[in-house]
């Protein structure tokens, strides 16, 4: 209902503007829409825009998005060079750009920065359907008229402008999916787009999309401090091992409205609106077996026996809703030689997780005397651990022996709002030393407020008289692991049990609110030489932020902090033309990434040392410096009819990287701490990389009429250095895949348009398991470094154009059924193994 109200409000607004339109006889020539028909044409359109840009940018244009089997924005951008994607439930979620993780990149919608529904700065992109977008532009170099935020780069999503329409547009799309694991075909996805220039001076485009998708997935994993080594050098399981089963329905709904009004030949106004909602309705079962008391004589390179095994059967049910909404109003006009643009934006993101229960039941086998064992674990296949229970552990197979261990009701509400005003001025009639020059200058003010309110209620004591047998234990019927020991409490019955604990008392221990204001000024000149274009200038941003929270959740113990800092960033982008087809690029620019909100927020548990005005404990660090990067780019580009080749090299020198650390005898936020577990700027990092891109229409070179190929790869190397009391430690740069590659082979002729797309990403350091401990002063335990294994996927798209208006489409995703694998330090030490299966999609499209 609320989305219907939104729609009616927007359509009413559209009608109001239309009815108030000027009746002047002045007419403006319409801008013809660039129509890209077929996969090959749309790829060439993106390359043409890339060639014309004065920056290093990769572009996915219009219909090219629909020609990949990519449901979300994250999966679409993974096709570009320098981009890798972190997956969740088999779908792309966070984008890593040139080794920079999601929180170190800027994400914008039609020029307005997009806030993050989660607690940090990284924007999850698996909830943004590609049907709402017209193009995606990934900027790898920045100019002074762009925000400095994002040491990796800037990802810009754009919706279609009504002024680009030459005639009315009406499109329908309907798809359904089949997944190997869910076995369900009830996965509808439909979208609708309508747009028109209703008069010579007013046009509007409306888009709507909805998808409901059933997902079944399985994984097995081991926890932190997972593997030990015996005296013979054999590894053995030193912690818990668990199998997980996920059954969820993922629903996406979104709409866009774009309106353009040309008031006069040199004055126009526009309005952009985007709303996107993402709902996860999830049931998760966890079958966990904690190994203790290893029989040392039984340890081999692939197995070990244990005399104590604790079994936990955990069931979780939650409904999580995320929303992103952007509202933009702007315009442009001219006063003589001065061109003026303004933009006002209001962006909002929210994550609501207030329907969440987690229940755990426990049983145990323990041999206190004698030689009996509870069971033997085997890791001959490091990706699948297997357990054989001994007769002494028969209770672990009996649901009636499982008693209540934990019952938690979690809740959370994260809200993030950013308001911004942007003013840009431009004069094209300048000359400097007889060289034409465009002078630009501007100002931007933005204010951002983010709050985090999370907590939980422990109901274990109240539920303790009941055991699992009281909650109708059952075994999931789509359990695909080689081993099945699982029986679990009915999640619906557990979900109903939470009602006796509501309403919940507010838990303030994790509450914080941060306000951030940024004032930015820039000056930029574009020089147009006979054989070169040079864009040079400087941007300065001043940041002021304040944050507050409660020490250990005590409403009477408020912690307030504030801080101001500035950053000045010169930049230069040069494009030099060797001939009509060949150009060279070079650029230098500075950028920053502000600390994460959770890293600076006063999520605190601190206490005074016996009236000494000295404190100890744990807290965020409001004194953190932002990441700062100096960036260099050089590239060679060749564009010919039906053939494109580019090669580039980039380098990033990064200061003030942020990691967890325990500090001693330091003042943080005006408070002196004898010991504080917090975050700190530690050491420096650097990244060096090469990017190669190739596009060829094969019928120009081979007797392969209608065939084409596209290939890109990024080879990079990066590291982070830490100076500690035990010396200097060097590790790979976090989230950086040293090798990324995409290969597309396609056929586009007549009524058939098909493409096979291959995506490869090498392994990368996921995170340090030591985080939150004395990471830098006690040194690294390299066995606790988690890596994400390499990933290779095959996707197939085939479209048949039945008529000018009607087409049919088939998509196959993850056709090789490639799993996601994570390991501790070496690939034979399991951390996590996920399987999602392949997905097939069938659909119809109608346009008028």
Predicted segments with their positions:
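Transmembrane beta-barrel wall of Gram-negative outer-membrane proteins
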Residues: 182-291, 312, 320-330, 336, ...
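Short acidic/polar hinge/loop motifs at secondary-structure boundaries
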Residues: 112-140, 192
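N-terminal periplasmic accessory domains that precede
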Residues: 73-76, 93-96, 108, 124, ...
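Gram-negative outer-membrane beta-barrel transporters
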Residues: 651-654, 665, 671-770, 816
């Amino acid at each position: 209902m609320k989305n219907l109200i939104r729609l009616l409000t927007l359509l009413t607004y559209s009608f109001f503007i239309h009815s108030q339109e000027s009746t002047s006889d002045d007419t403006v020539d319409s801008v013809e829409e660039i129509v890209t028909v077929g996969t090959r044409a749309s790829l060439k359109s993106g390359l043409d825009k890339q060639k014309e840009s004065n920056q290093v940018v990769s572009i996915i244009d219009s219909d090219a998005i629909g020609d990949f089997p990519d449901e979300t924005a994250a999966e679409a951008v993974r096709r570009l060079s320098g981009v890798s994607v972190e997956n969740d439930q088999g779908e792309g979620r966070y984008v890593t750009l040139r080794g920079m993780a999601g929180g170190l990149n800027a994400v914008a919608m039609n020029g307005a920065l997009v806030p993050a529904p989660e607690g940090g700065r990284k924007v999850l992109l698996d909830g943004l359907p590609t049907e709402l977008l017209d193009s995606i532009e990934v900027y790898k170099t920045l100019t002074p008229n762009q925000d400095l935020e994002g040491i990796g780069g800037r990802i810009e999503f754009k919706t279609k402008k009504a002024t680009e329409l030459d005639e009315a547009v009406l499109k329908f799309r309907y798809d359904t999916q089949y997944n190997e694991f869910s076995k369900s075909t009830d996965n509808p996805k439909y979208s609708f787009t309508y747009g028109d220039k209703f008069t010579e001076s007013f046009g509007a485009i409306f888009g709507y999309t909805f998808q409901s998708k059933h997902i079944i997935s399985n994984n097995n994993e081991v926890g932190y401090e997972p593997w030990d080594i015996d005296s013979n050098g054999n590894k053995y399981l030193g912690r818990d091992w668990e199998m997980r089963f996920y059954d969820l329905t993922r629903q996406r709904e979104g709409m866009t409205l774009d309106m353009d009004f040309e008031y006069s030949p040199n004055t126009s106004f526009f309005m952009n609106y985007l709303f996107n909602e993402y709902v996860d309705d999830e049931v998760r079962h966890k079958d966990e077996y904690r190994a203790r008391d290893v029989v040392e004589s039984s340890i081999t390179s692939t197995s070990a026996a244990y005399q104590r095994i604790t079994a936990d059967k955990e069931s979780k049910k939650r409904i999580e809703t995320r929303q992103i909404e952007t509202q933009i109003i702007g315009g442009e006009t001219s006063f003589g030689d001065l061109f003026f643009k303004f933009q006002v934006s209001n962006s909002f993101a929210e994550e609501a997780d207030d329907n969440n229960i987690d229940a755990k039941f426990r049983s145990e086998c323990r041999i206190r005397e004698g030689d009996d064992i509870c069971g033997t674990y085997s890791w001959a296949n490091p990706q699948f651990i297997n357990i054989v229970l001994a007769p002494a552990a028969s209770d672990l197979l009996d649901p009636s022996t499982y008693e209540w261990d934990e019952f938690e009701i979690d809740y959370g509400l994260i809200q993030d709002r950013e308001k911004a005003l942007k003013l840009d001025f431009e004069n094209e009639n300048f000359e400097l030393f007889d060289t034409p020059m465009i002078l630009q200058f501007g100002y931007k003010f933005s204010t951002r407020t983010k709050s985090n309110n999370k907590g939980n209620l422990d109901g274990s004591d109240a539920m303790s008289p009941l055991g699992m047998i009281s909650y109708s234990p059952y075994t999931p019927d789509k359990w695909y692991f080689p081993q099945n020991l699982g029986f679990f409490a009915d999640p619906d019955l557990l979900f109903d049990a939470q009602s006796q604990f509501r309403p919940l008392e507010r838990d303030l221990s994790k509450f914080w609110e941060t306000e951030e204001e940024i004032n930015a000024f820039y000056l930029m000149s574009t020089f147009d030489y006979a054989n070169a274009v040079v864009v040079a200038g400087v941007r300065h941003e001043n940041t002021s932020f304040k944050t507050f929270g409660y020490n250990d959740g005590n409403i009477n113990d408020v912690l307030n902090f504030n801080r101001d800092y500035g950053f000045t960033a010169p930049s230069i982008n040069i494009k030099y033309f060797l001939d009509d087809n060949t150009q060279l690029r070079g650029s230098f620019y500075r950028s920053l990434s502000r600390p994460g909100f959770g890293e600076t927020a006063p999520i605190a548990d601190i206490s005074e040392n016996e009236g000494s005005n000295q404190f100890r404990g744990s807290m965020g660090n409001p004194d953190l410096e932002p990441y700062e990067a100096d960036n260099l780019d050089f590239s060679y580009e060749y564009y010919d009819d039906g053939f494109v080749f580019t090669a580039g090299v980039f380098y990033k020198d990064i200061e003030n990287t942020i990691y967890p650390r325990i500090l001693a005898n330091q003042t943080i936020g005006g408070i002196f701490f004898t010991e504080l577990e917090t975050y700190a700027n530690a050491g420096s990092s650097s990244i060096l990389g090469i990017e190669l891109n190739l596009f060829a229409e094969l019928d120009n070179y081979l007797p392969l009429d209608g065939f084409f190929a596209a290939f890109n790869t990024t080879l990079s190397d990066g590291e982070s250095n830490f100076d500690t009391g035990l010396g200097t430690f060097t590790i790979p740069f976090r989230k950086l895949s040293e090798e990324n590659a995409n290969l597309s082979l396609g056929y586009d002729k007549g009524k058939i348009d098909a493409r096979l797309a291959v995506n490869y990403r090498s392994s990368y350091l996921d995170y340090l398991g030591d985080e939150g401990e004395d990471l830098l002063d006690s040194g690294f335990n390299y066995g606790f470094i988690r890596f994400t294994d390499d990933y290779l996927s095959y996707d197939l798209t085939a479209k048949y154009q039945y008529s000018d208006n009607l087409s049919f489409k088939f998509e196959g995703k993850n056709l090789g059924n490639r799993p996601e694998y994570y390991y501790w330090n070496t690939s034979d030490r399991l951390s996590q193994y996920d399987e999602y299966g392949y997905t097939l999609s069938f659909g119809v499209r109608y346009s008028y």
